[in-house]
Amino acid sequence: MSLLLAGDIGGTKTLLSLWRPGGERPELVLEERFASADWQDLAPMVRHFLAVAGPVAGGVPAAACFAVAGPVEGGRARLTNLPWVLDSAGLARSCGLPLVELVNDFAVLIYGLPHLDAAQTAPVREGQRDPQAPLLVLGAGTGLGVAMGLPTAAGLRAIPSEAAHGEFAPRSAAEWDLKQWLRADLALERISIERVVSGTGLGHVARWLLDRHHPGGDHPLSGPARLWSEAGDGPDRADLPAAVALAAAARDPLAARALELWLGAYGSVCGDLALACLSRGGLWLAGGTAAKLLDGLRSEAFQGPFLNKGRLRSTLEPMPITAVVDPGVGTFSAACRARMLLG
């Protein structure tokens, strides 16, 4: 039976796994985690993995799909946080693989969505999905991922998007104040959507509220917020957004307000993008916040702004929203795409 090779390539860690095509969904055979920085390139890592895992699994993979943290153009990808330049044809030759495809690590989720089971998802909003219509996946994590899926005779086709880097459009005086504060605090000429609508954005919203209401640093989150800001994007940066979510769950007023503002901005952006591509095939929410903030996504704080699109509210009302709660969805989706490559 054919084997599939799937990889989720990130700046910190890389997951490589072997799968069997299976029936309705690929079946995991084995998986190994690697520290990306320990390797000069992806090819030697893959060769090492196949030399050890291949004999155990029963052969050489017939197809491989690697989800990479960065844009992919013409079968080539330059990773955002690694000095690697990947080429699908070169990887195929170097690793002895018949078929290799590189896909952006968020766009690849499109290929996994039709095969997710109930344990990998959670309903956010009930609705009626049109299987012939486009679908949309958004993921608020460190940044904001956006991708569309178009139904074709050969299955879904993933369309990457950089919509998260559009301009953040304030809807209220509070959001306007937040945007101006971020411009000054981050020394930026413009504020993109993902500066607010992302896990990182939740941290920024909390910092803004702390600056406005507790300038003397007397709030329990003041210290963590200062350390988080000073750490920049370093690997030892504490998780301020998680601390804000925990404080909100404990009914801290400032943290609850930060989460409410963030959910409203997220819901509004989801509604805007759902209208942009008329995603009657459904809206899927992935990323690190989907499972952690499920109650918030089901609340009026998120769903009210999602639907608040004037005359187009009726277009969004039937649209189902589903959260992807499986942390391993990246490699699973890459395996689904590798199976598609076999035709």
Give the residues covered by each predicted segment.
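Active-site nucleophile and cofactor-binding loops and adjacent substrate-binding regions
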Residues: 34-36, 79-83, 101-108, 126-130, ...
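Short, acidic Gly/Pro/Ser/Thr-rich loop/turn segments
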Residues: 14, 71-73, 143-147, 204, ...
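Short, electropositive alpha-helical surface patch
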Residues: 117-128, 203, 338-343
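Short glycine-aspartate micro-motif
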Residues: 4-8, 61-65, 101, 135-139, ...
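Residues on a specific face of well-ordered alpha-helices
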Residues: 44, 89, 108, 142-146, ...
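ATP-binding/phosphotransfer module of carbohydrate and carboxylate kinases, centering on a glycine-rich
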Residues: 1-58, 180-343
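Glycine-rich phosphate-binding loop of actin/hexokinase-like ATP-binding domains
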Residues: 123-126, 131-195, 199, 294, ...
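Short beta-strand-loop/turn "lid" adjacent to the catalytic site in phosphate-handling enzymes
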Residues: 54-102, 107-122, 137, 291-295
